[in-house]
Design a protein with these regions (language model features):
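Acidic carboxylate-rich catalytic motifs and surrounding loops in phosphoryl-/glycosyl-chemistry enzymes
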Residues: 108-112, 155
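Cys/His-rich metal-chelating microdomains
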Residues: 126, 151
Length: 157
């Protein structure tokens, strides 16, 4: 826990904190500008269930339609001594996001995990199929699920 505390203190000294980011997300949403949130999950720094609940609850308080991308960390530069993010941790963050009520939660920086698709929040139909580098198939029709007709939030659908 010492590393986590030191990292938080250093983050506070070297930045304005997270509040300007949170305020910007709220403002952009109020202005009707499409936004997506990405969290790079770094082992020992921001990989607790408490962190995931906090992020998911914040996003949910703004809009359940905001996609949350949960990305794996790989050791590099000044954090070479840390391990890569375990898949189980990423998957737990995804579960927390979905349990909180977010409609669109994705895993990033990992392959062959089966959690990159966009599914209809109402009926579960796969709407968009992806690979690591792009979209394979987009089944959304006029911003609606072709199966149940639910309106699907997004840009360029």
């Amino acid at each position: 826990m010492k590393l986590r505390e030191n990292w938080r203190e250093q983050k506070k000294r070297n930045s304005y904190g997270e509040q300007p980011v949170l305020d910007t997300i709220k403002m952009l949403n109020q202005l009707g500008i499409w936004i997506e949130v990405t969290t790079l999950v770094i082992p020992t720094l921001n990989d607790t269930e408490q962190e995931f609940h906090s992020i998911a609850e914040f996003i949910m308080s703004v809009s359940r339609e905001i996609p949350w991308h949960i990305s794996a960390f790989y050791p590099a530069y000044k954090l070479k001594y840390l391990p890569p993010t375990p898949f189980a941790i990423l998957n737990r963050a995804r579960e927390i996001g979905l349990e909180t009520g977010l409609h669109y939660v994705y895993l990033g920086n990992v392959t062959n995990h089966g959690n990159a698709e966009t599914k209809c929040p109402d009926c579960g139909q796969i709407l968009i199929e992806r690979t690591k580098i792009g979209i394979i198939k987009n089944n959304v029709q006029d911003n609606r699920c072709p199966n149940c007709g639910m309106e699907i939030a997004g840009v360029g659908l």
